[in-house]
Design a protein with these regions (language model features):
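Generic protein-terminus/edge-of-domain signal
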Residues: 1-54
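…primarily DNA-binding HTH/wHTH and HhH modules…
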Residues: 2-3, 15, 244-266
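Short acidic-glycine-tyrosine-enriched beta hairpin
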Residues: 61-76
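Short hydrophobic/aromatic patch on the recognition helix
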Residues: 69, 193, 197, 241-242, ...
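Ligand-binding loop in jelly-roll beta-barrel domains
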Residues: 77-106
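Short, Lys/Arg-enriched, Trp-marked, Pro/Gly-tolerant hinge/linker segments that flank
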Residues: 126-189, 199-211
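Residues within the helices of the helix-turn-helix
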Residues: 179-180, 228, 244, 255
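Terminal helix-turn-helix DNA-binding modules in bacterial transcription factors
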Residues: 199-239, 243, 259-266
Length: 266
């Protein structure tokens, strides 16, 4: 392997600090598999992409799911934690804040074939590439990023301190209970909890809980779980009840969704 290839293709446990470089764009490529980045932030903007597997991104007050073949834009200074499962063809690009991208909010976007090729090429750039040689493709990237279709894979967390212990349980893998159970758990009446969720998330608790279950279902399907496993974990009374729920919220079945996000065979 060439020196350039060795520098761009890294192992999950290799030390890497994107903020130590001064080039406009720094890219890396890796086969992450299972990895937990821990909570951190960058001085640069970051774009994450993977061809297969799922990435859950925890923010201070939100949860994001990054499905395969989408990209997430993370503005500089955003504290986040990326939890990866079965991730293949992981690509991460880091952008100087001097580039015309600073107005972009955190978002998940669809990646079309041209955008993918741009991401792929930049991920394997030599870290010593002169800035002048990066200019033309950076221009294409900016055009594609600004034109990319944004998708809603984010769930806001409530910020009321009465729910902090409960939220920590969710982050540890617990499922949100029914409203009457949550009321007993946190010691607040159902009406109060409803007001908190409307105020902090724009959704009532029942809708918020359904959205949480939907994102968890998509995460598990992206990880290769069978429909029956997902239905049982999310406490549906039957596989058919889960399939109906999934179709109602996405317009497709879990089976078709899984087929569309699995790695494409050559």
């Amino acid at each position: 392997m060439s020196d350039i290839g060795q520098k761009m293709k890294i192992a999950p446990d290799d030390a890497f600090d994107a903020d130590s470089f001064d080039k406009p764009v720094i890219g890396i490529a890796s086969e992450m598999g299972v990895h937990d980045s821990g909570r951190h932030s960058h001085l640069r903007h970051q774009l994450l992409y993977s061809a297969a597997g799922s990435i859950t991104i925890e923010l201070e007050q939100a949860l994001c799911l990054l499905p395969p073949r989408r990209a997430v834009w993370i503005p500089a200074g955003t504290v986040h934690r990326a939890i990866m499962r079965g991730v293949m063809a992981y690509r991460s690009l880091y952008f100087s804040t001097t580039l015309p991208l600073s107005d972009l909010p955190l978002q998940i976007v669809d990646v079309n074939p041209l955008f993918f090729e741009v991401i792929e090429r930049m991920s394997f750039w030599s870290w010593e590439m002169p800035a002048a040689q990066q200019t033309s493709l950076i221009t294409v990237f900016c055009e594609e990023m600004c034109a990319a279709h944004s998708e809603n894979w984010t769930l806001q967390y409530p910020s009321d301190p009465r729910l902090n212990v409960w939220l920590e349980g969710l982050r540890m893998g617990e499922l949100p209970p029914r409203l009457n159970q949550l009321s007993r758990q946190v010691g607040a009446c159902e009406r109060t909890i409803g007001r908190i969720f409307i105020r902090d998330t724009g959704m009532n608790y029942q809708d918020w809980r359904q959205q949480f279950r939907l994102l968890k279902a998509m995460e598990m399907l992206a990880d290769g779980c069978h429909i029956s496993q997902v239905a049982q974990y999310l406490e549906f009374v039957s596989d058919s009840a889960f399939i109906a729920f999934f179709h109602q919220h996405t317009g497709t079945t879990p089976g078709r969704y899984s087929g569309n996000i699995m790695p494409q065979k050559d």
